[in-house]
Curated annotation (Swiss-Prot):
Gene coding for it: NS
Assembly and binders: Homodimer. Interacts with host TRIM25 (via coiled coil); this interaction specifically inhibits TRIM25 multimerization and TRIM25-mediated RIGI CARD ubiquitination. Interacts with human EIF2AK2/PKR, CPSF4, IVNS1ABP and PABPN1.
Note on domains (UniProt): The dsRNA-binding region is required for suppression of RNA silencing.
Lineage: Viruses, Riboviria, Orthornavirae, Negarnaviricota, Polyploviricotina
Protein name: Non-structural protein 1
GO function term, MF aspect, one: RNA binding
PTM comment text: Upon interferon induction, ISGylated via host HERC5; this results in the impairment of NS1 interaction with RNA targets due to its inability to form homodimers and to interact with host EIF2AK2/PKR.
Length: 220
């Protein structure tokens, strides 16, 4: 096992612990809490894959971070912060829409790269809007937190979510998954639209519906 893979996991575990303390002291906002929950699932998956105990990894991660901070000068920290690009968090969904449980009458699930796509195939002849919460950097989608498909009545009929066991995804992964979701919904004569945020940062298209033409694979 690569030593850098292990040390990266250990540091991530400790930093997650620090962020959890921030939430416990009620200092974190909704996007901060969303990322914390998503990263918790990711760490569990990575720990299982690596065969490492999260509690033990957190202790070692603390030692690594403390050693780095001891060697870090204030001036170097200022320069690092000034040069690092800042990401933005965009929210199409409310906390209620993001956390709501939903059920499928005719469930279909497909894995597309590091993303899981779920569609209720019982939904027909509906107007559907895709909404997502995600971060943006350099004017492009950085990390998808969650994407959901809503009917005009507010029912959830589809979803795209990152797989905890496969952390990390690209904008192309997200585009492909959106194409599969749209294709599955349109198969049952539903009309699908994409939110303005998704159109701008993740689904850049040239047609009048704000979408790329779907490939035969995505239409299935």
């Amino acid at each position: 096992m690569d030593s850098n893979t292990v040390s990266s996991f250990q540091v991530d575990c400790f930093l997650w612990h620090v962020r959890k303390q921030v939430v416990d002291q009620e200092l974190g906002d909704a996007p901060f809490l969303d990322r914390l929950r998503r990263d918790q699932k990711s760490l569990r998956g990575r720990g299982s894959t690596l065969g490492l105990n999260i509690e033990a990894a957190t202790r070692v991660g603390k030692q690594i971070v403390e050693r780095i901070l001891k060697e870090e000068s204030d001036e170097a920290l200022k320069m690092t912060m000034a040069s690092a690009p800042a990401s933005r968090y965009l929210t199409d969904m409310t906390i209620e829409e993001l956390s709501r449980n939903w059920f499928m009458l005719m469930p279909k699930q497909k894995v597309e790269g590091p993303l899981c796509i779920r569609i209720d195939q019982a939904i027909m002849d509906k107007n559907i809007m895709l909404k997502a919460n995600f971060s943006v950097i350099f004017d492009r989608l950085e990390t998808l937190i969650l994407l959901r498909a809503f009917t005009e009545e507010g029912a959830i009929v589809g979803e795209i979510s990152p797989l905890p066991s496969l952390p990390g995804h690209t904008i192309e992964d997200v585009k492909n998954a959106i194409g599969v979701l749209i294709g599955g919904l349109e198969w049952n004569d539903n009309t699908v639209r994409v939110s303005k945020n998704l159109q701008r940062f993740a689904w850049r298209s040239s047609n009048e519906n704000g979408r790329h033409p779907l490939t035969p694979k995505q239409k299935r």
